[in-house]
UniProtKB/Swiss-Prot annotation:
Alphabetized HAMAP family for the sequence: Ribosomal_bL36 (MF_00251)
Entry similarity comment: Belongs to the bacterial ribosomal protein bL36 family.
Annotated S-S bridges: none
Species for this entry: Rickettsia prowazekii (strain Madrid E)
GO BP annotations listed: translation
InterPro entries noted in UniProt: Ribosomal_bL36, Ribosomal_bL36_sp, Ribosomal_L36_bact
Keyword Endoplasmic reticulum: no
Protein name: Large ribosomal subunit protein bL36
NCBIfam families reported for this sequence: PRK00831.1
Gene label: rpmJ
Gene Ontology MF, one: structural constituent of ribosome
Superkingdom as given in the UniProt entry: Bacteria
PANTHER family: 50S RIBOSOMAL PROTEIN L36 2, LARGE RIBOSOMAL SUBUNIT PROTEIN BL36B
Length: 41
């Protein structure tokens, strides 16, 4: 999982990426291709 300061460019890497907020942190998840996961922080 990548840790980045801005998730906007990582959301555009794949059409199935979606942004979710869990436990106060913002994540990019992709259920079809797990290697596109990222976390902001």
């Amino acid at each position: 999982m990548k840790v980045v300061s801005s998730l906007k460019s990582l959301k555009k890497r794949d059409k199935d990426c979606q942004i979710v907020k869990r436990r106060g942190k913002i994540f990019v998840i992709n259920k079809k291709n797990k290697r596109f996961r990222a976390k902001q922080g």
